[in-house]
Amino acid sequence: MSGEVSHRAGFVAEEAVARIYERADRPVTARRWRGAAGEIDLIARDGAEVIFIEVKKSKSHAAAAARLSRRQMERIYGAASEFLAGEPLGQLTASRFDVALVDGMGRIEIIENAFAA
């Protein structure tokens, strides 16, 4: 996949995942939020809880899951920490890290609490 096609496919996958969260009354409050440590694909809220969502797209859900590296998780943690610093409760804010896997057919599997800080 070329860079532009890959970028567009990632954007479409993120929008589809955002719609799932929105339909579940978990409003998406930020898309592609960038801090000094890295980028978070989507940030949603479930009441007072902040949900950091990493979207992975590949041929299969297993292949998508395999694309999430330890190094990438560390960058997500760092960016999430920066984001939480701006919350009223700071690092004490309830939060979780979800991973949304999107396969080649556009099917979405969401893994809540996929990894922990």
From Swiss-Prot:
Pfam families: UPF0102
GO molecular function, one term: nucleic acid binding
InterPro entries in alphabetical order: Restrct_endonuc-II-like, tRNA_endonuc-like_dom_sf, UPF0102_YraN-like
NCBIfam families with a match to the protein in the record: PRK14676.1
Membership in a protein family: Belongs to the UPF0102 family.
Name used for this protein in its record: UPF0102 protein Rsph17025_0472
Source organism: Cereibacter sphaeroides (strain ATCC 17025 / ATH 2.4.3)
Lineage: Bacteria, Pseudomonadati, Pseudomonadota, Alphaproteobacteria, Rhodobacterales
